[in-house]
């Protein structure tokens, strides 16, 4: 009965939109993607249309596994995964720098991943 209740609760959450999907997490190194780069991007502020175009272009890039609009020094923070430094150079020069409205790019290379994926902190829901 315990397993049935757990599955029922997951089904209810799934229907309520709490669960956004299910995925297998691959080990990047094991599939030849040994370099993770966090890329801060500043964009030109001339037209909202350009910013929308930039968001659309970034969303279509398979190397970009996460993209966030952020406050601070950069406008966007991208998480890029590529095989190696040479592949990142090719991606940077051949793709990123050519996106609509890009003004400046700052690359930060991950030396070691300490916590790749954590669960959401849901303690506040129990209050």
Pin down the residues of each PLM region:
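Short, low-order "capping/linker" segments at domain edges
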Residues: 82-86, 115-127
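Beta-hairpin "wing" of winged helix-turn-helix
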Residues: 16-26
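Short beta-strand/turn micro-motifs at beta-sheet edges
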Residues: 25-30, 65-66
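Single conserved hydrophobic/aromatic residue that forms the stacking wall/gate
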Residues: 1-12
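Short glycine-/aliphatic-rich beta-strand segments at the starts of folded cytosolic domains
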Residues: 28-45
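Alpha-helix C-terminal capping/helix-coil junction sites
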Residues: 14-15, 59
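Conserved beta-strand core positions
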Residues: 8, 37-39, 76
């Amino acid at each position: 009965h315990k397993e049935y209740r757990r599955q029922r609760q997951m089904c209810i959450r799934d229907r309520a939109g709490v669960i956004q999907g299910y995925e297998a997490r691959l080990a990047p190194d094991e599939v030849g993607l040994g370099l993770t780069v966090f890329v801060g991007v500043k964009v030109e502020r001339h037209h909202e249309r350009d910013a929308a175009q930039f968001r659309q272009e970034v969303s279509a890039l398979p190397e970009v596994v996460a993209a966030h609009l952020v406050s601070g020094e950069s406008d966007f923070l991208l998480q890029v995964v590529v095989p190696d430094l040479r592949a990142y150079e090719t991606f940077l020069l051949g793709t990123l720098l050519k996106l609509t409205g890009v003004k400046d790019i700052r690359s930060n290379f991950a030396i070691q991943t300490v916590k790749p994926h954590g669960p959401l902190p849901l303690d506040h829901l129990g209050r």
